Amino acid sequence: MTLHARGVFLPDEAERDVWIVGGRLTFTRPLGPTDTIVDRGWIIPGLIDAHCHVGLAPSGYVPDVDGQVAQALLGRAAGALLLRDAGSPVDNRAVQQRDDLPRLIRAGRHIARPHRYIRGLGVEVEPADLVAEVVTQAANGDGWVKIAADWIDREAGDLAPVWPDDVLAAAVAKAHELGARVAAHVFGEDALPGLIAAGIDSIEHGTGLTDDLIATVAGTGTAVVPTLINIDNFPSIAAAGAAKFPVYAAHMRALYATSRDRIRTAYEAGIPIYTGTDAGGSLPHGLVRDEIRALVGAGIPQAEVIAQASWRGREWLGLAGLVEGAPADFVVYEEDPRVSLGTLQSPRRTVLRGAVVD
């Protein structure tokens, strides 16, 4: 039977009816009987978690399908119906085979350098092999490649760029030639000029974005996925390394202290800011609502955060919003989430690929 829903649609704020035919939306009533699944509320495209790691957990790798499914279900329960996996050491493509799980856009494995990232998490190559590995991971992912662009340099005792700028530029150019976009892990300031000059597509974390760097990024189309709820771990990371690497520890504390101001300044400069949790490392999955609250707490207007977490974020990742013929992926809330963050905790209905899943 054809499913029917009525409510106020965002972002256009129009109250109207929609029907689901073949997993897609239509605003023209079809022939035959219909089943109304909701008759009021605020209807928005499913939320996005634009930085998570399906197949990773605080306890370690999750290679089994059941464990990965459980992680994806946590995201779905929070309203995240589109996940961008920002690198995973295990094969998580099984999640893509389940119609009841969020859509998953994969970035293959992280590309890192030996001794310059979390051990065993990424594919480790030297600079001479970076471009070739980008080719491999572009083929292994779904239009995204993930590069670790800075990490602690133990000899220097502080964060430092991982790749020479010319090599990084060649790697990003090769990804673009292959039709892939590049996301870069970067905490500090020093790796950012090379990334920006290379045409990086997505800055992950971005705590090193100074005012001058923000001015350079603005207008380029480069996005930032700040993962604020993971940045909240910086003080504990600093404490763990303080005895051996005091300069690094002080740097991490300073980055944490300015993180909210810097992301707000980036937003005010017009840089797109998208929601991502970094789930799978030190954080569990299903925390997109916490990240939304953190971004609002940083001073970004709530309506803008919801837009970037929903219809604008989906568009950035290549999916349509609530328009004729679009995939029927939406969440219905009792109140307007641009006004009430609390309503995100209790969705009335969740529809994924045209089926009611919650």
Question: Where on the chain are the PLM-derived regions?
Answer:
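Histidine/acidic residue-rich metal-binding segments in metalloenzymes
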Residues: M1, D129-V224, A240-G241, R253-I273
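N-terminal metal-binding scaffold of metallo-dependent hydrolase/deaminase domains
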Residues: M1-P33, I43, V331, E335-L341, ...
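Metal-associated gating/positioning segment near the N- to mid-region
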Residues: G41-D99, H115-G120, A198
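Hydrophobic faces of well-ordered beta-strands that scaffold small-molecule active sites
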Residues: G46-C52, L83-D85, L104-G108, V145-I147, ...
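Acidic/histidine-rich helix-loop elements
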Residues: V54-V65, P114-V125, E155-P161, S236, ...
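Active-site environment of divalent metal-dependent phosphoester hydrolases
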Residues: G55-A57, P89-R93, A112-P114, W151-E155, ...
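Histidine/acidic-residue-rich catalytic or RNA/ligand-binding cores of hydrolases
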Residues: P58-V62, L192-A198, N230-A243, D261, ...
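His/Asp/Glu-enriched, well-ordered alpha-helical/loop segment
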Residues: E177, Y256-D336
